[in-house]
Amino acid sequence: MGALDVGIELGVFLDIPPKVDAPMGLGMVFVTTNDYGAQLNVNFYQNTACRNLEAVIQTTMEAKFKQAPTSAAGTLRLFFHDCMVNGCDASVLLASTPGNQAERDAPINLSLAGDAFDAVTQAKTALEKICPGVVSCADILAIATRDLLSMVGGPTYPVLKGRRDSRVSRASDATRQLPTANFTVNQLNALFGSKGFSQHEMVTLSGCHTIGFVHCGEFLNRIYNFSPKSQTDPTMNPGFAQQLRLSCPDVNLDPNVVVFLDQTTPKIFDNTYYKNTVKGEGILTTDQELFTDLQTRPQVEQYALSNSLFVNDYISVITKMGNLGVLTGTQGEIRRALDCASVN
């Protein structure tokens, strides 16, 4: 049993995302006119040599999942971080160049999992052997996310296709458009609202944390010296806080250590994330805020009682997110780099 296997059993493991250094050109910013993918189509590749792309991607993801089960959570997070920043255009996959710091190198993205980037690379490599220059990196990421999610018990759903890849990626955009671990419900509502999501949809998307993981540094302020009167955030279950302190000591903490956001069923996509917040076991401030804030508590309680309600809502919201701000038609390009890290 390796270090990763041991860590998974303990609910804590190491994740060190690799860096990819590849050139990226600068192009004009393309703005799509369709808000939620009106030009996308489930059968977009039907009349191309890539008509079997879903089978190819699924086979590739099965191999990736067998090699690294945490790829499911990592790829889902990568997809979210791509779509929330100027739309689902694979801009998060582009590498920085001497003249430009790309999204993936923004501080908030430095913890994106290396296995997630590799999942896209593996699928792109397989497809380029069959039909070079046809399938976009953005479509691959959307389909790979769905497939990996299904391997941890998540729902399967049709993925609309026809996204094109952006030629632009800026770290400053990621910093402005992604939520941090300490966001309040009002801040979350404002950010998600700017992307066209309702509060209800924001709470549903937060359920992605049922298979997520996070570095200790993102929540140390909740379990150590929270205030002059309390070591622990009073909204956190004291016993749970002590459990987290064992995984994340405040002395000589390894910055690469991460813990599962759902400590109960970390390998299963289900509604346990919401059950945990009801018990005061939300790890991030943003997690626990969903129950603490009376605006969102009723929905959290509903999801905690019904896995089917959460899953059905999730299918609708993840589909909407996947169609957010997409490039279509002649916008952007179909990236040819196997790692999707550089423009053509």
PLM features: residue spans?
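Catalytic cores of secreted/periplasmic or lumenal enzymes
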Residues: 25-344
